[in-house]
């Protein structure tokens, strides 16, 4: 018999249900979590034994959305779900980031978390539900995991924090912040904001952490009722004698190496020290494991860097804790792009371009929550040469997708609306050098490139990465961290914004015990760094260019009667296709009659506008037009009068005398003046050549051909 164990609780305006014991009973743990009809099924499987020689923690998080959850059938030839979308990849990272630090050091058994969205309420985003499910499943599994964690989304509407706002509420929110943490401390923050202050952002983090305690309590209660026994896992005993021997050989040399400011030179020296130390020790004792020795050396490296920072000594590259690396800012570096910038901060460099396109270039995204169109695209590329390595080049990896999304969040708050600037904008950041915080360099470069392209951004934005070293109550916050400081420190804290406030905040914390005070210090220090960078950027370009690039399409907007849209499009799109070919422009028509004509040449755009105005012009009864005969029938002729419209000239209206045969007076393609006699209810037009000729004596009336005289 299936005996599900269920916990139900109120979480803000939503009801959350945790259920286990019903499905996937061969998995290490499985939980179905639902929040007001959005349901995510999360499983965890952990291997009891680690693979021989395993020297890292192989945690995999897969998040997958099934279209049946929204009552849809997938598109595409195969009619089934394929590779993860960008959105699914971002949510998988969102789950991974707060749970990864909670596994004990030295635990290298393979663990896989799979979250499957099986039902979706369009107003309730599945990401928070999936995070709660992953926390519950890991806590139930018995795997050594120092959780559970809670997760909350925080909005800011009418100067009030809102817990887990609906999709509709988020449209009017100045903040979209996701926070996850344990009972004692915050572990992860991901957010975008409309230039809120440091205090407002910190308040949101604290609010979200306080509110999610009910999630942690209910998961703990579920574990008491249905949890599996804790695995009897113990870290390997520390070999103090070996640690001391390695330290004696390498510590002072590593300390000297970490005073080398050039990254590549430092890495080369550290590699030499490590390989020589391992070779010496293995020569003394062949039973020693090179991987174990490598881990000891890494711990020594970490201690060298951290102890120096905590003692108030200069950092790896000689800077003080709040110093920013040297900046070099250039715009307009590529001649044919619409906008470009090269932003260099120390050994981190981003070549960023901005490209303008039409509404047709916008990305149509079909998500589980519904369809949407994105007219601001941000792509981040991290080639292997940026860190002096060789490697695969191809489709973007999870990290590139995540960094691109963070950089996009940083810029989004200052972008103009589609009504203010009717272009699709694509920003591409090519990381050409990397030694820490390439995503924040991308924010700075994007701001510069957008201004260079003439995009009317509301303000310049800059980003900075902060780090933390903490031992006991002693802590130091570092500004503009290097890659090594990120790797060896306790926190990665990225802040982007303008002079007026924060547009994006991302925080990943590797230890427990990060207090509100520490976050306050980090935010305030980040503000000073951000303002310094903005000052340097403003020396290069302090406002958007007055005009867009000569190579960018210029969009001209006109309005037509919505009833005339069908005339401009034509049967099967024939008229609009002919127009685009004739004028060399791109033409887009919206349902409300807004017509956007895009062209790199102003004359071509004006030609297209004139032609559209001709097509959509109302036919005036009594007006005389110049027409062209398009068709001849027994009872008259059809004459085109411009704008794709034609009318009938009845045989009685061709001449002021009796006409026996139409072809005696008119030929195909002949140009004739015509007067509009009537437009009936069905839009049919009655024309007269006879009356047009009478009113305009100078117009040549068609005459019957004179019969040839026989010789």
UniProtKB/Swiss-Prot annotation:
GO biological process: mRNA catabolic process; RNA processing
All residue ranges annotated as the S1 motif domain in the record: 622-690
Reaction catalysed by this enzyme: RNA(n+1) + phosphate = RNA(n) + a ribonucleoside 5'-diphosphate
Compositional bias per record (Low complexity), positions renumbered to this chain: 699-711
Highest taxon, organism lineage: Bacteria
SS bond list: none
InterPro entries: ExoRNase_PH_dom1 (IPR001247), ExoRNase_PH_dom2 (IPR015847), ExoRNase_PH_dom2_sf (IPR036345), KH_dom (IPR004087), KH_dom_type_1 (IPR004088), KH_dom_type_1_sf (IPR036612), NA-bd_OB-fold (IPR012340), PNPase (IPR012162)
Quaternary assembly: Component of the RNA degradosome, which is a multiprotein complex involved in RNA processing and mRNA degradation.
Protein name from the UniProt record: Polyribonucleotide nucleotidyltransferase
